[in-house]
Amino acid sequence: LNNIIVFGDSAGAHIAAQAVLLATNPEYERAIGVSSAITAEQLSGAVLYCGPYDVSKMLNTGNKVIDFFASRIGWALLGEKQWQEGEMIKTTTIKDYTTDQFPPVFISDGNSGSFESQGKDLANHLLSKGRDVTSLFFDRNEYGEVGHEYQFSIGDGGAGSLCYEQTVLFLNRISESRHEMNQ
């Protein structure tokens, strides 16, 4: 397996980003006590849709429903009821563990009821580190409201269709690049 591309959506985008960190940063492996089954050399890229990349930013939003949901997700993910106060919360901030081994990544999110600011923060952080980032975010003035999980609406010619097209272009580009490297 030498052309692995990890995909994730919503919480799965966070998990996919963690898989990238495990493969590219031994410090992260030690911090969470998990060894990666894949190496950085095996990774060709990552596709991250609508994900939270800094779980601590999901706390105390002022919305009781979101706060309750976030508290339960954190508890399930980290195994501690008071997870907000534990050491593991530090490991949920993806950008704190990125290295120059981070593979090409496609990051996208809607602009309503999702994690757009976290996606933009991660994309900008990776760009500032010289990483290969393709991102797709939506201006409300041009696209209107684009919600969480928008990418599954691919038949309407709107944001979901654009995401599909951009994702295919990204995958083709990184696959061709990987193929050229291996020749």
Regions found by a protein language model. Give the residues of each.
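Alpha/beta-hydrolase superfamily serine-hydrolase fold, recognizing
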Residues: 1-183
